[in-house]
A protein has these predicted regions:
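Feature 3881 marks metal-assisted phosphotransfer/nuclease machinery
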Residues: 1-123, 127-239, 246-343
Length: 343
């Protein structure tokens, strides 16, 4: 069954009701195995324990490469991408959140009534897959209230994300990880899935938020030049964010306001999460890993026949491994979807 990301509460509820209030999210392979352990509680006090450190995960990924080849291992996210997916859920934070908040307090939230120029945010390519506008809290979805008045998007960022590397031979993945990888046929592999996440963020900001698209070639210098040209031609201030210090320094050399976004190098032992953050975590891990498992259910981030609408609506595919849970999930999902249609 195909499920929108915001309806994954149905799965969490069903796990809780059947006695799996504490469960693991796992990769199907023996080499990778357990990723995180989740304990469900009230809506804002669930617990996520990080079973595998970044170095430990990197070593396990290397073992996959040794046993099955680089082609198979490259489908797994790098340790940094695994961490970034967790950050995108909001469960762990950036290393320099205080510095970012100070930057936003200083340069964001302009007083337009007093004649101050509006502030627009722009991003480097490396941040786009990770729901960066939402995680930074730049404005409130729907209301537009927040630190910035809108966004500037360089088309070079879009083009750096817009590439596809699809699976046309599922046999190596089935041999390494199991029969669930039959669903990989004609679906994006590895970094291409992460690029697709970035494109979704780009298009959401462009089409739904207050955004201006500026033409640019690919590459840091071309992207920064496009932001700089827009900044000079418009009465506005642009603030740029990147995980790359060189990008930030180049932006500052153009007299643009740049802020480095630092990711942590380790996981905390555990973290508190809301149910909504757990929905995001399950969705992000399903996409970056391709396939994950929870008790009695396999969750596919990609599957044979997944199309653009499935990506746009952030759908995953649930395959019940237990005949008891499948009709209950289908019934719960039908109720939730009917409620959405009525509202």
């Amino acid at each position: 069954m195909r499920v929108k990301r915001e309806h994954l509460t149905v799965l969490l509820n069903r796990l809780y009701d059947r006695g799996d209030g504490s469960f693991t999210i796992e990769h199907p392979s023996d080499e990778i195995g357990e990723l995180v352990r989740v304990t469900l509680a009230s809506h804002d006090s669930c617990t996520v324990r990080f079973s595998t450190g970044m170095d430990e995960y990197a070593a396990a990924r290397q073992q996959v490469s040794l046993e099955y080849g680089d082609h198979v291992a490259d489908d797994l996210p790098e340790a940094a991408e695994f961490r970034n997916a967790v950050i995108a859920s909001g469960i762990i934070d950036f290393d320099n959140r205080d510095e970012i908040e100070t930057f936003l307090d200083r340069y964001g939230d302009p007083d337009l009534m007093a004649g101050h120029p509006p502030v627009f945010a722009g991003f480097d390519t490396n941040l786009m897959p990770w729901r960066i506008d939402r995680v930074l809290g730049l404005n409130e979805p729907g209301s537009g209230v927040g630190y910035v008045n809108g966004f500037v998007l360089a088309t070079g960022v879009r083009d750096e994300l817009d590439w596809d590397y699809k699976c046309h031979n599922t046999d190596p993945f089935i041999s390494a990880f199991g029969r669930s990888y039959e669903e990989y046929w004609n679906q994006p592999l590895g970094s291409a899935r992460i690029g697709r996440l970035g494109l979704l963020t780009y298009r959401r900001i462009r089409d739904i938020e207050q955004a201006v698209e500026v033409q640019s070639d690919q590459g840091d210098e071309a992207i920064i030049n496009a932001y700089d040209t827009y900044d000079q031609n418009q009465r506005s201030d642009i603030i740029l964010f990147s995980n790359d210090r060189n990008f930030v320094e180049r932006a500052r050399a153009h007299r643009l306001l740049g802020q480095h976004v630092a990711f942590p190098n380790t996981y905390p032992r555990k973290s508190t999460a809301t149910w909504r953050e757990l929905e995001l975590l399950v969705y992000m891990l399903a996409v970056v890993f391709g396939v994950i498992e929870v008790p009695s259910v396999t969750i596919h981030g990609v599957w044979r026949g997944k199309d653009q609408l499935d990506w746009q609506h952030e759908r995953v595919k649930l395959d019940a491994r237990s005949p008891k849970i499948e009709p209950k999930l289908e019934g719960d999902l039908s109720i939730v979807e009917s409620y959405d249609e009525l509202n």
